[in-house]
Amino acid sequence: MIDIERNQDPSGFDNNHHHYSSILSDKIGLSIHAPDEWQKIIPPHELERLVKSGDQVGIHVLVGDIRKSTFLMKESISSKRFAQITRDFMKAVRDTASKNEGWFDKFTGDGFIIYWIYGDEENQQKYISQILSFSDALLSIFPEVMNEYRTNSTNFPADTGLSLGIDSGLCTLVNIEDLNIIGPPVVGASRMVAEAEPFEVLFNVSIGTWLNEDKER
């Protein structure tokens, strides 16, 4: 753990906090992974402690999969154009996740992994509304992305689409070149997205139960 003396300027800006965050960002690439104002979600010293110790923390995990992405790449008129469409969509994914307090784990080649750190078990319902907003936003914009792929394809498959799978539970934050997550919820979300139809979202049992309870209220 890094010890830094408290240092705040007259305007109230915490130089200490900013310096600590900058050091941590350099270590694990937070500019790629963290949402804006991530320090409000988890203090920098707590994030560093979790990465160093390997202690588990409660996390919601969302895995997205672009159906038929390998086929789309193979049938592309221009590989460069395919890469540009995918890159632009991944930027939209990161930006939308950040606006909904989600962390970008990685681009998987045919999809992505996003997560929300809720912490202790009693806070497990936290971020459900943000996850729903994120999912709705992506499913709303993906038809436009599909049209971009279609205009660049010599043979566009009918079952192209975006599928989402969501699981929740204890994960470990690790530094493998930069910040990554590992744990059963990653596996669970991956299994659910594999079963989801194009433009379908599959949730784990606990999240599905909370959603049903909200509908009944």
Give residue spans per PLM region.
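Regulatory cytosolic signal-relay segments
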Residues: M1-V57
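Extended catalytic cores and adjacent scaffolds of nucleotide/polyanion-binding enzymes
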Residues: I182-G183, V187, V201, V205
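Acidic, glycine-rich loop-and-strand cores that form catalytic or ligand-binding grooves
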Residues: S129, S133-L138
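Alpha-helix/helix-capping structural signal
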Residues: R67, G169-C171, V187, S206
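Cytosolic regulatory/linker segments at or just downstream of nucleotide-handling modules
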Residues: F199-R217
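Catalytic NTP-binding/metal-coordinating core of nucleotidyl cyclase/transferase enzymes
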Residues: L47-Q130
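Catalytic core of nucleotidyl cyclases, primarily class III adenylyl/guanylyl cyclases
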Residues: K99-Y127, V145-P184
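Substrate-engagement module of ASCE P-loop NTPases
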Residues: D88-D95, A137-F142, S190-A194
